[in-house]
């Protein structure tokens, strides 16, 4: 393996000013490049460990395979930069502009990306390890397919319209994050904190939300078909119009959740806590609600055809205008349940 070429900062800047752009595989350890313009420079494979590049302009720069560990790129402009396969340990990228940049295959460990702009960036297969900071980061339209962000701090991050297929966000903190219209197919969000997060109109098919905290989350119109929500907390979540066909909601806490017009056909809701939940107009065709707690729940106009409610607690529930044809209500608690105009399991209408 060839020895990295060493060059002084002044010499590099002089050669750059003369029109040279290729500085691949050079060594610039602890170099100081603050507030310098190096647009379109080729620093692929360069060693920039501990370099100071605060406010540096690196638009369209090639930093692929570069070593940027312990470097400070705070407020640097890296628009459309190539950081494919770069290594960054404890790198500071606070409020840097990485919009349109490619970080595919890059490894970032304990990196500070607070307030960074990653709009439209490509992070396919990128690894952000050991609790990297992405607080208030902007990732609008970014591609994070198969990225590893387990345990990442992403409070208040904006991921609207981003592609997150097969992403690993297990244990990540996404409190208050916005994920409107994201594609999150087959993602791993087990143990993630999504308290107050906005996932409205998102496609989240076959994703794992096991023991995730979705308290107060906005999931209106979201497609959660086949999602695993086992052990998740959805207290106060808004699931109006959400598609939860075949979803695993076994034993879930959905207390006071808004599930109006939601599609819960064939969903597993065994033992779920739906106390005070709003299920008005919801589709619960062939859903399994055995032993579920539906105390004071609103099921007005809900479709409960062929639904299993064996042993469920429906005390004080509103079943007005609901359709219960073929439903199983054996051993269910119907104390103080209102059933005005309800179609009973045998097809008769309750008066």
Label for each model-derived stretch:
Residues 2-351:
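Tandem repeat scaffolds
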